[in-house]
């Protein structure tokens, strides 16, 4: 089932809008003939998502879940569709159910954290981001997700720590270095910001890409 999640995610954008519409039309006819075929419904929902037909996708995932309440693909992507429609309570419910079944799914945890942020639940989102770091201590993205939220909340000291941890795990990611430099510039710590940029250049980032931030260090 998790392989299906990867397959669906990777196939996004592989077809044109017209091809997706043709696929959905064909699948509608197949579903009419085989209404209990969950694979057909998942494939149609994928087409609906790629056409941004969120309500239709949610309807298909509902059919799937009525037959298989623990279908991970349906839960995960229905949560995504609910998020697109700003149905945050329903998105949260689907992510919670998904994570009860598959508690160590990185993208689902990030999806839940995003929903909690949209709902304005500051304490819960920080708890979720802390959990993500605990579950995935080797993931640069885990630290970066927490750092981004801390930066937004102006929790600069802890954000700097998390950006450092993200950089340590993925030193080639220039966005992490720039994010750290942005905080240092906001704190008027220009020398440290420049050192952060210099370190990124030493790791292989072309200096020209960082000109905007170097100029602000003067």
Residue positions per predicted region:
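Bacterial N-terminal signal peptides
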Residues: 1-7
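N-terminal leader/linker segments that initiate helical-solenoid repeat arrays
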Residues: 8-55, 59
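Structural signature of tandem alpha-helical TPR/SEL1-like repeats
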Residues: 17-26, 52-63, 84-97, 119-131, ...
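Terminal, low-structured helical/coil segments at or just beyond the last alpha-helical repeat
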Residues: 18-23, 182, 186-218
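Structural marker of alpha-solenoid helical repeat scaffolds
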Residues: 33, 67, 101, 135, ...
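Helix-start (N-cap) detector for alpha-helical repeat units in TPR-like alpha-solenoids
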Residues: 38-39, 72-73, 106-107, 140-141, ...
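Position-specific recognition of the canonical hydrophobic site in helix A of tetratricopeptide repeat
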Residues: 49, 76-83, 117, 144, ...
């Amino acid at each position: 089932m998790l392989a299906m999640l990867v397959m669906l995610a990777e196939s996004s954008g592989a077809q044109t809008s017209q091809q997706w519409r043709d696929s959905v039309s064909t699948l509608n006819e197949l579903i009419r003939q085989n209404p209990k075929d969950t694979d057909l419904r998942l494939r149609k929902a994928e087409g609906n998502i790629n056409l941004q037909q969120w309500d239709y996708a949610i309807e298909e995932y509902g059919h799937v879940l009525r037959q298989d309440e623990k279908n991970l693909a349906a839960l995960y992507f229905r949560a995504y569709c609910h998020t697109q429609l700003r149905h945050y309570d329903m998105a949260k419910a689907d992510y919670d159910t998904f994570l009860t079944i598959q508690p160590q799914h990185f993208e689902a945890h990030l999806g839940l954290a995003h929903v909690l942020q949209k709902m304005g639940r500051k304490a819960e989102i920080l708890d979720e981001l802390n959990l993500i770091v605990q579950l995935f201590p080797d993931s640069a993205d885990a630290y970066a997700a927490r750092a981004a939220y801390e930066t937004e909340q102006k929790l600069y000291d802890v954000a700097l720590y998390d950006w450092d941890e993200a950089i340590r795990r993925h030193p080639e990611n220039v966005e992490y270095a720039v994010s750290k430099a942005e905080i240092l510039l906001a704190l008027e710590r220009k020398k440290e910001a420049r050192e952060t940029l210099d370190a990124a250049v030493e790791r292989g980032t072309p200096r020209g890409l960082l000109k905007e931030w170097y100029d602000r260090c003067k």
